[in-house]
């Protein structure tokens, strides 16, 4: 199957501006939320033996730690905390309203979106520093990001899905920790585990005993963690046990990942961090031929692989070139698939911009 450039529907200039404005507002909002999360949960005066003492709770489960009796120093500390807390609350409310306004505009322009269930999960992963640093989004949910970065609606590929696939990327070249990007606010060993983030959203999430790489909640919603052999073993604190034999996951840790912000059907917004579209495309083509693959998924895999290669050809040649350097980087199994697509599509890797 081959898709012509006319099969894609480019976003308007207004849509492109709206996407950029939404992303800027979301990033500011999540920065404020992280600042709030880093502050003590509360700070208050408590009386003991007729004297006032300043107490601080670092978290909701904290019983409180005394900072000392009332004095000019503790009063200054309390005043600074109160002022900063108020500042962040006001700023968060303002940015939340701004994000909502920009979400409404993006939805009116019918830009790509995810279901709110996926959106909430992605916001929490981002807030706690896992998205991009420890995990990236793979599978069908990634296609909203590919449409956004291409600036065009795909004829196929971005299809509804009832599950959520993540791939482990900590310690790899595609992790934000290895890319020219702000350093993570927490060391890897101090970040929350994937399961702890899921439980913040829904305490009923539990590991599926038959599939230890999968967590399921009481509503039956599934979150799967995939991991390339090179990333094993996972840290001790991770409850997930992904299979160690999925060599094809190595391919999704190549190239240049994509990050963007999309809307959800709540309406709300959420970030996406997904594999390089070139590698995702050939990965999908390979999956469509994998003997062990569920036959019901193979048709979608083939559609997604072909449409993503065509989209990359038409819209991303500057950032994701598919010239000879890329072809030579492909392992033989993927190179044959890419060559077959190129011949059928009339694409010449020696002259990719023709």
Regions found by a protein language model. Name each.
Residues 1-52, 59-61, 66-354:
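Compositionally biased terminal segments of proteins
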């Amino acid at each position: 199957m081959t898709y012509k450039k006319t099969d894609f529907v480019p976003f308007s200039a207004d849509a492109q501006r709206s996407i950029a404005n939404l992303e800027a507002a979301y990033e500011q909002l999540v920065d404020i939320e992280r600042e709030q999360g880093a502050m003590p949960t509360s700070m208050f005066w408590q009386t003991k033996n007729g004297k006032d003492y300043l107490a601080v709770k670092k978290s909701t489960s904290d019983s409180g730690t005394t900072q000392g009796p009332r004095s000019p120093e503790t009063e200054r500390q309390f005043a600074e905390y109160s002022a900063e807390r108020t500042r962040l609350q006001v700023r968060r409310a303002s940015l939340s309203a701004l994000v909502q306004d920009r979400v409404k505009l993006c939805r009116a322009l019918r830009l790509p979106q995810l279901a709110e269930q996926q959106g909430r999960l992605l916001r929490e992963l981002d807030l706690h520093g896992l998205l991009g640093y420890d995990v990236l989004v793979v599978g069908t949910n990634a296609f909203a990001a590919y449409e956004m970065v291409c600036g065009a609606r795909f004829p196929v590929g971005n299809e509804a899905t009832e599950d959520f696939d993540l791939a482990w990327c900590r310690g790899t070249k595609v992790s934000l920790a290895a890319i020219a990007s702000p350093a993570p606010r927490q060391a890897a060993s101090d970040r929350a585990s994937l399961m702890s983030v899921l439980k913040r959203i829904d305490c009923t999430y539990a590991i599926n005993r038959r599939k230890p790489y999968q967590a399921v909640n009481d509503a039956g919603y599934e979150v799967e963690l995939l991991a390339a052999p090179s990333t094993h073993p996972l840290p001790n604190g991770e409850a997930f046990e992904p299979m160690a034999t999925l060599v094809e996951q190595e391919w999704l840790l190549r190239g240049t990942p994509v990050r963007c912000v999309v809307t959800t059907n709540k309406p709300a917004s959420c970030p996406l961090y997904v594999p390089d579209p070139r590698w995702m495309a050939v990965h999908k083509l390979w999956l469509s031929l994998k003997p062990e693959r569920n036959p019901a998924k193979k048709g979608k895999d083939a559609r997604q692989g072909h449409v993503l290669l065509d989209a990359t050809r038409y819209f991303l040649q500057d950032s994701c070139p598919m010239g000879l350097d890329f072809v030579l980087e492909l392992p033989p199994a993927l190179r044959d698939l890419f060559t077959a697509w190129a011949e059928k599509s009339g694409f010449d890797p020696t002259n990719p911009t023709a």
